[in-house]
C-alpha cells in the first residue's frame, strides 16, 4: 500500500499556490480575500440550479422546505435507506460538479436515496440557520426511514458541518444516524492547523 496525498489533492494544492486561493482563504491577502468573500456572497444569494452539463444518471427531484432547496437522488425502485449528503466548499461555496458526481455515484452504488440540501452559506448566513434547517430535514428523514437506515456523509467543510449537527441531535431528542461518514472533514475552521 502506498500512503500519501492523492493526485487530485496534489493538483489542487498546486492550483491554490498558483492562483493565490489559499492565501486569499487564509486572509493573507486581504483585498483578494474580501473580493473572494464578496463574490461568494453574491453567488450564494442567487437561486441554485444544477448545471445542465453535470451528467447525473440517478432519478432526481427537488423540493423546498422552509426556504431550503433539497435535491433527492434515487433509483427506479423504492429506496429503503437514505443518505444525507453535506457538500464541502469552505462553508461559502455552493456544491460543485465533483460533489454532484460523488452524490450520484453514492446513490447508484448503494441504492439509497441521497438527499442533497442546498444549505445556507456564509458570509450571508451563519451556522445557526444551517443547523436549524438541517436538523428539520434530518427529522423528516427519521420519520420516513428510521434513524437506523440513515447515513450522514459530509466532505471537507460538509464533514465539519455533519459532525456539528449530529452533536445537536440530543438537544432535539433525535436519534443518532446508523452511520456518520466524514471524508477529509474540515474540523478546524480557524484553518491554523
Could you say what each language-model-derived stretch is?
Residues 1-75:
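A glycine/proline-hinged amphipathic helix-loop "lid/cap" segment
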Residues 62-71, 77-193:
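Alpha/beta-hydrolase superfamily serine-hydrolase fold, recognizing
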Amino acid at each position: 500500500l502506498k500512503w500519501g496525498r492523492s493526485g487530485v489533492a496534489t493538483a489542487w494544492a498546486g492550483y491554490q499556490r498558483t492562483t493565490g486561493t489559499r492565501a486569499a482563504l487564509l486572509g493573507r491577502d486581504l483585498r483578494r480575500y474580501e473580493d473572494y468573500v464578496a463574490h461568494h456572497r453574491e453567488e450564494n444569494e442567487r437561486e441554485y440550479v444544477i448545471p445542465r452539463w453535470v451528467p447525473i444518471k440517478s432519478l432526481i427531484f427537488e423540493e423546498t422546505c422552509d426556504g431550503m432547496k433539497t435535491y433527492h437522488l434515487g433509483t427506479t425502485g423504492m429506496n429503503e435507506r437514505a443518505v444525507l449528503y453535506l457538500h464541502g466548499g469552505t462553508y461559502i461555496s455552493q456544491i460543485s460538479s465533483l460533489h454532484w458526481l460523488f452524490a450520484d455515484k453514492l446513490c447508484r452504488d448503494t441504492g439509497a436515496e441521497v438527499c442533497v440540501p442546498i444549505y445556507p452559506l456564509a458570509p450571508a448566513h451563519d451556522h445557526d440557520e444551517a443547523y436549524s434547517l438541517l436538523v428539520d430535514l434530518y427529522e423528516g428523514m427519521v420519520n420516513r426511514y428510521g434513524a437506523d437506515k440513515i447515513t450522514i456523509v459530509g466532505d471537507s467543510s460538509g464533514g465539519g458541518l455533519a459532525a456539528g449537527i449530529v452533536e445537536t441531535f440530543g438537544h432535539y431528542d433525535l436519534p443518532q444516524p446508523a452511520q456518520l461518514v466524514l471524508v477529509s472533514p474540515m474540523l478546524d475552521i480557524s484553518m491554523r492547523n
